[in-house]
Amino acid sequence: GPNDRKLPGNERMISAWPARGGPVVLEDTIYFAAGIWPTDGVYVHALEAATGKPRWVNSETGSMEINQPHGGARAKSGVSSQGYLLANEKQVIVPTGRAVPAAFNRATGKFEFYHLQKNQKRGGSAALLVDQFIGNSGCLFDSASGELSAQIGHGPMVAMPDGIVRASG
C-alpha cells in the first residue's frame, strides 16, 4: 500500500493492504495484488523475481466510478483481487470474486478492462487462461476485451492442449 498503516487481522497486526489471492511468476517477474477494499486502494504489483525490485505498480483501479450490478447504479468501486492471478505473454489477469476478472498490460501495468456490472451473476475466484480466452464461472471471456464469448456450464474446468475440459455432476 501507500504507507505502513496497520490494522488487526487474524489476531495480529497486518498491513491495511495485505497481499490478496495468489501471486503468479512468469519468466523473471512476480505479479501480485494487495488491498481488500477498493475505496482504500488496491494495488497490482510486478517485481523482479531475483531482487524484489519493483517493475511497475498499478494503483489506479481500486476506486473507479463504474456501473454497479444493481439496476442503473453508479458508484466508486473497483478491482479487488479474490483468487489466484494469471499471466500470459501480454496480460496479468486478476480474478475478482463475484465479477469477471480484470486485465492489466503485463509489460506496463496499464489497466485494460474490468466489467463489474456488464456480466451480471458471472465471475468467481477460480479462473484459467487458454488460447485467447479467460475461463471463469462456466464462461469463456475474450482476453483482449473481457467480452463474453461462450457459456460452457458450471463445474471445474481444466485447460488441455486441444481445448478445455469441463466436469459436470
Give the residues covered by each predicted segment.
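Repeat-blade elements of multi-bladed beta-propeller folds
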Residues: 14-44, 70-101, 115, 119-143, ...
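Hydrophobic, small-residue-rich alpha-helical packing segments that form membrane-like cores
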Residues: 1-3, 9, 21-25, 46, ...
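Beta-propeller fold detector
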Residues: 1-3, 7, 55-63, 68, ...
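Beta-propeller blade signature
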Residues: 42-53, 101-105, 109
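Short linear interaction motifs
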Residues: 4-9, 73-77
